Regions:
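Positively charged, small/polar-rich N-terminal and surface patches that mediate targeting and assembly
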Residues: 1-125
């Protein structure tokens, strides 16, 4: 029986010169990450505004978010039974401005409800 050498196969992909060299890459134009945290009571209002303003068509929603900010705590317990909801949106600078206006509008409309909004830079990889 002949002695066969096993060849080692390298599965490491060749380095890409740029994102555009990767056929899986689809530029989404997302440059801003927005985190919006509000009481669950405002969830429908945000979704309605997103639809009317045609922004945040793609978002991540985290339900049952607990925390304490500048309004009443939302801890989901016997003392503070309410909970928050959190939206994470990746969007363009222009959509970010529209969403900020939605946040300000709902803050004016619901002055006693907690609404937090954080904006940071994002890069799709």
């Amino acid at each position: 029986m002949a002695d066969k050498k096993k060849e080692r196969v390298d599965f490491t992909p060749a380095p890409l010169k740029s994102k555009k060299d990767d056929e899986r890459y689809t530029p989404a134009g997302a440059v801003v990450r927005m985190e919006i945290i509000c009481t669950q009571a405002l969830e429908e209002d945000f979704l309605q505004e997103f639809g009317e303003q045609k922004v945040a068509a793609r978002y991540t929603k985290l339900a049952g978010v607990m925390g304490a900010g500048y309004s009443n705590p939302c801890l989901g317990d016997a003392i503070w039974p309410q909970l928050n909801v959190m939206f994470i949106v990746y969007c363009s600078e222009a959509d970010c401005e529209v969403i900020k206006n939605i946040v300000w509008k709902l803050r004016d409309k619901y002055r006693t409800e907690g609404i937090a909004c954080f904006v940071s830079r994002a890069e799709e990889v």
